[in-house]
Amino acid sequence: MSVTVNKPLSLAKELFLSIALVAQEISSDTVKEMKKDFGESVIRNSVIRILTNKGYIQKIGERSEYGYVLTGDGYDYVRIKMPDKFPYLIFRAPTHIYDRVRRVKRRQMSLVLYHLYREGVAFDHHLTELDAMINGEPAEIKEPFFVTQREISQSSTQLNTAYGTRFFGVIVTQTKIIIVYAPSKDKNLYARTESGFYQSITCAFSAATPPFNLPTNIEYIYFYQTDEDMMDSFSEKGKRNVHTASTYRTYCNSRLKQSYIYRMNGNTFRLSDILDTDKRKAIDAVFSEYYEVQPRAVSHLKDVHVCGFYRNTDIPVFMLWDLSPSALVSAIDYTRQPGFGIDGKVYLMCFEEDADLIAEILNTDRQLAKHFAICDLPYQEVMQYINGEIARID
């Protein structure tokens, strides 16, 4: 195989090949998203057609289920063109490229990787930094990065329980570790398995450099491809049978931990809004100022997600602008605790663009929904206010 090493790859081609390598397949949905950003002609002609004609990729599947995988020559091509970018031995070409179960997860991974790229989260070679962190060595984290399930299992034998779950990897920021899941309507999480995996994560990072050794700095994010998948995750089906897959029960088990939902079909907030601690606090402050939320007393430990109380009342306020499933489950549990009256109220703070979605989740139980009031603000106006572009939010 003859390859011109010095000729740089275009951004579109480099990204396409990188995702195909790391995810093991690039799905039709990911291709569609790339066409939106780079242009139909660029992806179809300058990327897919050229790589196919040279024998570097091959198409598998049919119709909406199609995807592209690297060939043996394609794998060698990526190693030559980007020699230091990935731990290539970990991402050797799959031997079961037509296995349907494996394909579902690989295709989902490719879409997650593309959204991470859009949000400025790198997914190239960071295994060395992760190893250093786990071993307690100093690690300078300049920008958020993503490390895949495959890399993590190679890094620590304590994390082998990652296999068989909807766990995809972790996002590492300057202050925290965020466990990445991508469940769906057909692939719910097993609460017991995920609880065990969380214990493995906390154990593995117990000797890490501060602040990564603190369990409070380990969080969750759930990537959903459709709103239907997200809505279904709040279904209480199988709630009483611990052997049944139930993402809702997983939410309940992690109720006291910080978590977020990212909608890949059109997320309202940016990933940086939750990864950047200062930005997150700024958004919380805007909602608190606008709706006159009084901060809770330090001694109020009933629920970590109660951020305060509305004006001078005893109405609890929950921040839900990050679509936190643990906060929503906590808010629901709040209405079921002893002493909560039939006329009791709970306020949920969210972005205007997500208000209908949250209301739809709550309306699955009419008796429950009557206890909630949704307080919303437009995302763009909140950002403009934080950036000093407008003096106030109308």
Range-by-range predicted roles:
Residues 180-189, 201-214, 218-394:
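Long, compositionally biased intrinsically disordered regions
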Residues 19-23:
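Short helix-to-turn junction characteristic of helix-turn-helix DNA-binding domains
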Residues 93-199, 203-206:
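Exposed, interaction-prone assembly regions rather than primary DNA-binding/catalytic cores
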Residues 24-35:
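Short acidic, hydrophobic short linear motifs in intrinsically disordered regions
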Residues 1-16, 98-103:
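Short alpha-helical segments that sit at the start of domains
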Residues 37-53, 59:
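Short amphipathic alpha-helical interaction segments
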Residues 49, 58-90:
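Accessory beta->alpha helical hairpin/"wing" motif in late/C-terminal subdomains of nucleic-acid enzymes
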Residues 57-59, 122-127, 288-298:
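Short secondary-structure junctions
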